Amino acid sequence: MGYNAGSYDVIVIGAGHAGCEAGLAAARMGSKTLMLTINLDMVAFMPCNPSVGGPAKGIVVREIDALGGEMGRNIDKTHIQMRMLNTGKGPAVRALRAQADKFSYQHELKKTIEETPNLTLFQGMVERLIVEDGECKGVITQAGAEYTAKTVVITTGTFLRGEIIMGDLKYSSGPNNQQPSITLSEHLEELGFDLVRFKTGTPPRVNSNTIDYSKTEIQPGDDKPRAFSFETTKFIMDQIPCWLTYTSTETHRLIDENLHRSAMYSGMIKGTGPRYCPSIEDKVVRFNDKPRHQIFLEPEGRNTQEVYVQGLSTSLPEDVQRDMLRTIPGLENVEMMRTGYAIEYDAIVPTQLWPTLETKKIKNLYTAGQINGTSGYEEAAGQGLMAGINAACRSLGKKEVILGREDAYIGVLIDDLVTKGTNEPYRLLTSRAEYRLLLRHDNADLRLTEVGHEIGLITEERYERFTNKKLQIEQEKERLSSIIIKPRPEVQELIRNIGGSELKDGIRASDLLRRPEMTYEHIHLLVPSEVELSDEVKEQVEIQIKYEGYIEKSLQQVERMKKMENKKIPVDIDYDAISSLASEARQKLKDVRPLSMGQASRISGVNPADISILLVYIEQGKIARVSNQ
C-alpha cells in the first residue's frame, strides 16, 4: 500500500557524480529538490579511479565550475596531489588532473548537499515512475512512498540490473557490492525505452605497507599551486606522490595461461566494454608485441593503506589476480585488499533524448550520467549539472539551456550522445571537439560564467570578479598593441639570451609576443605594466595574442556552423512525406529528430544530399505534413 510522501519541483534519483550536480544545481536555482539514493553512505562515491580530471575531462571540471557546479570546488578541498598535464604542448590540450582522497571527497560533498537550502536527501530505492498522459509526475519507492514532482532526473550510474563478474563468479550487485536497481530497469523497458548492456571494470586494491616503493618511480604533484575552481584561494601544499611500475613478461605469461578463466574471454560477459579503458587481459592480447604496460600505484586517501592499481582493471578470478600482482616489480610481496571485477549494467540508448537531456518519450523526465552510456565521473557530473539546470528551468517556467559544440566540451559530449548515440561506454577526448582551440582549460570562465550567472548559479560577487578580470585582459591587450619596443641594447640582449632574432626596427609589444620564444614575462621585463595583474590575466593575454590567428580561424568556422544551427527543423516534421530522402537517412532522422540542420548533418547515415533535400523543404516553407494531421 503506497502513501503520499511529499511534493517537489525536482526529484533526482541517485547521488553519484551526476546526481550530486543535478540536485545542487536545481536547489540553488530555487527549485524544491529531493535526492533519493539507495545508500546515504555512498553519496559521491568513487567506485573506480580515485581521481578527477585528465585530458578533456579536466576541462569539463573547469566548465562545471564556470557554470556554478560543485565538482571543482570539492576536489580542490580534498585532493592529495594535483598535476597539469601536457604542459609541453599547446594550450588546447593542457588539462589538470587531481588524485583524490576519495573518502574526504565523499564526506565534503555530502556535507555540502546537507547544508544546501531547498535540498532534501533521503535514503530510498526508486522502483517506478509515476507517468500520466506521457508526462512524468513523480516516483514510487520500494517502501511504497509516492513523491510527486514537476520534473524527475534519473542518475542511476551502473546500478541498473548491475552484475559483478570475476572469472566464473557472477552475482547481482551494484558497484562495490552495493544493492543493484533491478525493478526500475524493468520499468523503463515497460515504458518503451530501448536499453543496452554495457560493461566496465576496476582493478584490485593493495596494502601500501606491503609495497616495495624502491622498485618503482615516484610521480609527484606539481610544486606550483593548482586548482580546478576559479574561486579557490586556499591551496593544499602537503601532497602525496603516486608511483609508476610496469607489468613483466611473467605477468603476461600468467594472463595468457589463464585467459580461459577471464570473464572477458569465457563468454561470461555480454556487455560492451570501454575502448579507452581496456582490461589488462585485453591489453596483453591486443598489444602482444609490447613487453610491458604501465601500472600506476595511486593512494586512495590520506587515512587509508588502500592503493588503487591503475592499469590493471580485470575480470580474472581472485586467485589469478593475487598471483598476477606479485609478478609486478615492487609488488612481489603485496597483499591484495580488494579484488578487481567487471560490472555489467543497463544504459538507455541516448538518441532517445533531446539536447536538454529530457527524454523524447516522456515529458519532464531527464537522464544523466552512465545511464546515458558514458564512462567517467567528469562526463557524469557535466551531464548531471545540465540535466539539473534544465529540470529546474522547466519546473520554474524558464527557458532551458543547451550548450553548443563551440561553447563547451559538455556541449560536445551531449551533442555526440543525442545525435550519434554510442555503441560502447563513451569517453570524452580532445579529438572529439572540432573547436578545441576555443575550448581550453584556461578560458572556461570566459566561455561560461555569463551562462551560470544568467541562470542564477554564479553569485554577484563572483560575477563582479569575473567582469573585472575580463576588463583587465582587454586593457592589457590594448596596451601591448599600442606600445612600440625599439631595438635598444637591453632589448637585443634579452632576445639573444632566449635564442631569438634581434630587432631590425621598432615593433609593437603584441607582435613581439607572437614570437614562439617570447613569453608575457619577457615582454613585462621590457615594458612593465603599472597595474598588478594576476597570473590568470597574464596567461590569457599571452594565449589570446600568440594564437590570435588560429583562434580567429576557429571563430570563422563556428560562424559558418552557426548558420546551419540557426536553420531550425520543426519538431513535428514528418520525414515519411519527404520521398526523395534516402531510406537510411529517413530512418535516422525519425529516430534522432534533430532540432536544427546542423544537428541533422552530424547524424551518421545522413549524407550531404539528404541535407540539401531537407534544406530545400525548410527554406522554401514546404514543410512536410505533420504526422498528427
UniProtKB/Swiss-Prot annotation:
Indicate where this protein resides in the cell.
Cytoplasm
Instruction: Tell me the disulfide pairings in this chain.
Output: none
Task: Tell me the GO molecular function terms.
Answer: flavin adenine dinucleotide binding
The Swiss-Prot or TrEMBL record lists the needed cofactor(s) as: FAD
Q: Which GO terms describe its biological process?
A: tRNA methylation; tRNA wobble uridine modification
* Gene3D superfamilies assigned to the protein according to its UniProt record, in alphabetical order: FAD/NAD(P)-binding domain, GidA associated domain, C-terminal subdomain, tRNA uridine 5-carboxymethylaminomethyl modification enzyme MnmG/GidA
Sorted alphabetically, the keyword list is: Cytoplasm, FAD, Flavoprotein, NAD, tRNA processing
Q: Where does FAD bind?
A: 14-19, 126, 181, 370
**Which amino acids does the record list as binding NAD(+)?**
273-287
Look up the domain of life of the source. Answer: Bacteria
Q: Which GO terms describe its cellular component?
A: cytosol
Q: Which PANTHER family match?
A: GLUCOSE INHIBITED DIVISION PROTEIN A, PROTEIN MTO1 HOMOLOG, MITOCHONDRIAL
Q: Quaternary arrangement and interactors, per the entry?
A: Homodimer. Heterotetramer of two MnmE and two MnmG subunits.
Identify its protein family: Belongs to the MnmG family.
> What is the purpose of this protein?
NAD-binding protein involved in the addition of a carboxymethylaminomethyl (cmnm) group at the wobble position (U34) of certain tRNAs, forming tRNA-cmnm(5)s(2)U34.
What's the protein here called?
A: tRNA uridine 5-carboxymethylaminomethyl modification enzyme MnmG
What gene is behind this protein? mnmG
